[in-house]
């Protein structure tokens, strides 16, 4: 048992119920009046955009998503780390709206961030860093680290903020349920193809057995980008980046946010993305 505690980077193995430990909360995303969907005034006289733009915004195929990405890099000269920082901040912001620290049973709330070997994993590292700044207690599992300066720097930034990294993944869903209040799935993004290999096949098997909520970044890992996966993990929160992908039509969780407020208007028009009007200075928009 002492080895397990040391491995997971937490002082105590806290026993608890295998149900999401989230207090009741109010609707997290509010904005000003907009044409983007049916709205109503709440008791404070503010507009509540609870019903959002999921039937209007364009859902991208894998090919379209890749084309948009390439134009951002090549035509508009965005760098990978620049977009990764904006995406990761959006993810942390969406998590803070869906699961604010005050709604969680622990203080600070414990979050397990599982990062894959590509850019989606990089988004997860950035997300973990911002979650720490937002008052959460993230722990990272990053089993396949690319030998590239960008990812090495992201790891260093997290380590310098005293964010622990696990040496191995807990093998039992119950262990994760007991130690964490939320799991962030930052394993695979929209560019993933082929069969899921180890160690990620085993990781996804564990995630399917969780009772704590899962927040997936851009694509629920293991899903087909366009068709989804009814037998795969079922996140409670999906954070679509740039624009939703077609698989998001199969999402049945409670919260669907759009993040990544960096798309140039000309690019949005070219691909007819029909992105919603982000309220004020917000970097995320609730679609569902």
Curated annotation (Swiss-Prot):
Please list the GO terms describing molecular function: identical protein binding; metal ion binding; NAD(P)HX epimerase activity; nucleotide binding
Cross-referenced Pfam families, in alphabetical order? YjeF_N
**Localization terms from the record:** Mitochondrion; Secreted
Transit peptide: which range?
1-47
Q: In which tissues is it expressed?
A: Ubiquitously expressed, with highest levels in kidney, heart and liver. Present in cerebrospinal fluid and urine but not in serum from healthy patients. Present in serum of sepsis patients (at protein level).
Q: Which Gene3D superfamilies match?
A: YjeF N-terminal domain
Q: Where on this chain does K(+) bind?
A: 120, 185, 221
Disease in which the protein is involved? Encephalopathy, progressive, early-onset, with brain edema and/or leukoencephalopathy 1: An autosomal recessive severe neurometabolic disorder characterized by severe leukoencephalopathy usually associated with a trivial febrile illness. Affected infants tend to show normal early development followed by acute psychomotor regression with ataxia, hypotonia, respiratory insufficiency, and seizures. Disease course is rapidly progressive, leading to coma, global brain atrophy, and death in the first years of life.
Q: Which gene encodes it?
A: NAXE
Q: What is its EC number?
A: 5.1.99.6
Cofactor: binding comment = Binds 1 potassium ion per subunit.
Which reactions fall under this protein's catalytic activity? (6R)-NADHX = (6S)-NADHX; (6R)-NADPHX = (6S)-NADPHX
Q: Which organism is it from?
A: Homo sapiens
Q: How is it modified after translation?
A: Undergoes physiological phosphorylation during sperm capacitation, downstream to PKA activation.
Name of protein? NAD(P)H-hydrate epimerase
On this chain, the residues bearing Phosphoserine are: 49
GO cellular component terms listed in the entry, alphabetical order: cell body; cilium; cytosol; extracellular exosome; extracellular region; extracellular space; mitochondrial matrix; mitochondrion
Q: Which NCBIfam families match?
A: yjeF_nterm (TIGR00197)
Q: Which GO terms describe its biological process?
A: lipid transport; membrane raft distribution; metabolite repair; negative regulation of angiogenesis; nicotinamide nucleotide metabolic process; regulation of cholesterol efflux; sprouting angiogenesis
- Record-stated family: Belongs to the NnrE/AIBP family.
| Self-association and partners | Homodimer. Interacts with APOA1 and APOA2.
Domain YjeF N-terminal spans what residues?
Answer: 65-275
Q: What does this protein do?
A: Catalyzes the epimerization of the S- and R-forms of NAD(P)HX, a damaged form of NAD(P)H that is a result of enzymatic or heat-dependent hydration. This is a prerequisite for the S-specific NAD(P)H-hydrate dehydratase to allow the repair of both epimers of NAD(P)HX. Accelerates cholesterol efflux from endothelial cells to high-density lipoprotein (HDL) and thereby regulates angiogenesis.
Q: Which residues bind (6S)-NADPHX?
A: 119-123, 189-195, 218
